[in-house]
A protein has these predicted regions:
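An N-terminal structural lobe/cap that precedes and organizes the functional/catalytic core
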Residues: 1-70
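Short cationic amphipathic helices and targeting signals
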Residues: 26-30, 87-90, 97, 167
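Conserved active-site and cofactor/substrate-binding residues in soluble primary-metabolism enzymes
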Residues: 31-34, 38, 70, 104, ...
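Buried hydrophobic packing segments
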Residues: 39-40, 167-171
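Internal, conserved structured core segments that host functional sites
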Residues: 73-139
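A contiguous pocket-lining binding segment that forms or flanks enzyme active sites
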Residues: 123-169
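Accessory, usually C-terminal, subdomains that scaffold auxiliary metal cofactors
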Residues: 172-224
Length: 229
């Protein structure tokens, strides 16, 4: 059982052996009582569970509280590395059924980041490396520097699971919801499973991927109301 205790402006979380701290010895604290109670309840589940996805939730949570100026800069550099390999820029064989589905689902997301952020992404059929507009890196860097710790954490983990800055930008801008995010990043896997039949190993990997994705979204939703205040 995790207890929530208010000290000054913040609510802190306690287990039997004391205040809950991150791997870098930072205390977990929030300013909103509703968020604090919800987080305490879910952390209790995670600490009790032997499920690796629940441990992953705690890792992501701790990651967000451990971000400082130096580590934030390192994370931004890692995110920028994905610019040239964005999932949404690489399409299936021209005029194929899958390519048609990719255009319908992915093109609106590319148009959104172009209109809102002036980020220009090119697409190709196949895996040949693409050269994008030179201003993309600087513009994305400015966007990322404005994100708070939680936002940057969510962005970073979505990037790691989707390999797409375009998807992450659309999600944090509230242009798409989490269901749409999953549909976009799992399009090819879902298509192959339906087209070629169920592959036990591939299906298990996709389900595992979704379970980790759900934990990222769980953290985002816990703090969403706090972000909007």
């Amino acid at each position: 059982m995790i207890k929530v205790i208010k000290k000054g402006k913040y609510y802190f979380f306690f287990k039997s052996n004391g205040v809950i701290k991150t791997y870098a010895n930072n205390k977990i604290k929030v300013a909103d009582v509703i968020v604090a109670k919800q987080l305490a309840k879910y952390m209790s589940v995670c600490f009790k569970s032997k499920n690796k996805e629940k441990s992953f939730f705690l890792r992501v949570l701790f990651f967000s509280f451990d971000l400082d100026k130096s580590s934030k800069s390192d994370i931004i550099d890692k995110i920028l590395f994905f610019l040239s390999t964005d999932l949404l820029c690489y399409r299936a064989k021209k005029n194929s059924e899958l390519e048609s589905m990719q255009k319908k689902l992915w093109d609106p997301l590319i148009s959104f980041v172009e209109d809102k952020y002036k980020l220009i992404f090119n697409t190709t059929n196949g895996v040949v490396p693409i050269t994008h507009k030179g201003t993309n890196k600087g513009r994305l860097c400015k966007i990322l520097k404005k994100l708070n710790k939680l936002e940057l954490t969510i962005y970073y983990y979505i990037i790691n699971i989707s390999n797409s800055n375009i998807i992450a930008l659309n999600f944090l801008a509230n242009n798409i919801n989490s269901k749409h995010v999953w549909k976009c990043l799992s399009l090819e896997e879902d298509y192959n499973l339906k087209k070629w039949g169920q592959d036990k190993e591939a299906n298990e990997k996709l389900l595992e991927k979704k379970s980790y994705f759900n934990e990222i979204i769980k953290l985002y939703l816990l703090f969403k109301n706090l972000r909007n205040k």
